[in-house]
A protein has these predicted regions:
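Flavin-dependent oxidoreductase catalytic cores
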Residues: 1-262
Length: 262
């Protein structure tokens, strides 16, 4: 996602499903169906290049308010053609087309991962699915299009996705996604740290957080894999230390780890 008028090519329009910001401000004409179809096809072309170059898997980023996620979000997708609609499964058609293009380009044997989130960088309180039923209908569209693994992004992985259903210690987003689709899932969100990434972008540090809850959830099969961000930026040996049980050697996060390495 690039803010209109910024580099590397300031005069180029910043695409969004309906040419709008999340506040409803018009920033560019709404793309035509042909232009949107070409955007979806571009994911396939890029994925084909990734396979040619020897990558082991492909992940499509459909989270955090970036382009694919904007098509999911009713606040930004006002389209009335095949790339929009009144409900979440209908608005998932762009993602499904990008997934099918990707699958066609990489073949049946290369893993295709799809990352999604409820929250957006434009609105941390946003939610796509308000119930397991809505989430299931949404995920079915993506799963049927060819997703192998779902990467389920939360700001804090330990938070239950639907506490009104299974309580304050209930399944997180990755747990519900695995339950509803039967597909492997990746959890992510402040793994190994006590506070989420928002503070990091404000220059705040974060203490380490015990991994006992994460390990317990893995052991019972709530999710299958774990993605780690800031903790690994702080300590490149994080995974090796965890594997060896050297938890006492894990380091607190310092915001300087986000600085450019000169």
């Amino acid at each position: 996602m690039r803010k209109a008028g910024t580099g590397p090519v300031p005069e180029a329009p910043s695409d969004s499903p309906s040419g709008l910001t999340h506040h409803g401000k018009v920033i560019t004409p709404e793309p035509t169906q042909e232009e949107v179809a070409d955007m979806a096809a571009a994911y396939g072309r890029a994925a084909g290049e990734a396979r040619r170059l020897g990558f082991d898997a492909v992940e499509l980023h459909g989270a955090h308010g970036y382009l694919i996620d904007q098509f999911f979000w009713a606040q930004m997708n006002h389209r009335t053609d095949r790339f929009g609609g009144p409900d979440l499964p209908a608005r998932a058609s762009f993602a499904a087309e990008a997934i099918r293009a990707t699958r066609a380009a990489i073949g049946p044997d290369l893993p295709l991962i799809f990352r999604f989130s409820q929250w957006k960088q434009q609105d941390y309180s946003a939610r796509l699915a308000h119930s397991p039923q809505e989430l299931e209908a949404f995920l079915a569209v993506l799963s049927d299009a060819g997703v192998d693994v779902f990467h389920c992004s939360q700001r804090r992985f330990w938070e239950p996705e639907f506490p009104e259903i299974d309580g304050e210690h209930g399944l997180n987003l990755a747990g519900w996604t695995k339950k509803l689709t039967g597909k492997p899932t990746i959890t992510v969100g402040s793994v190994g740290l006590a506070s989420d990434f928002i503070g990091a972008f404000r220059g705040e540090a974060s203490r380490t957080r015990p991994l006992s809850d994460l390990i317990a959830r893995l052991d019972k099969g709530e999710f299958d894999m774990v993605a780690v961000g800031r903790a690994l930026l702080q300590d490149p040996d994080w995974a090796a230390k965890v594997k060896a049980g050297r938890m006492d050697e894990l380091r607190d996060y310092d915001a300087a780890s986000l600085a450019v390495l000169n």
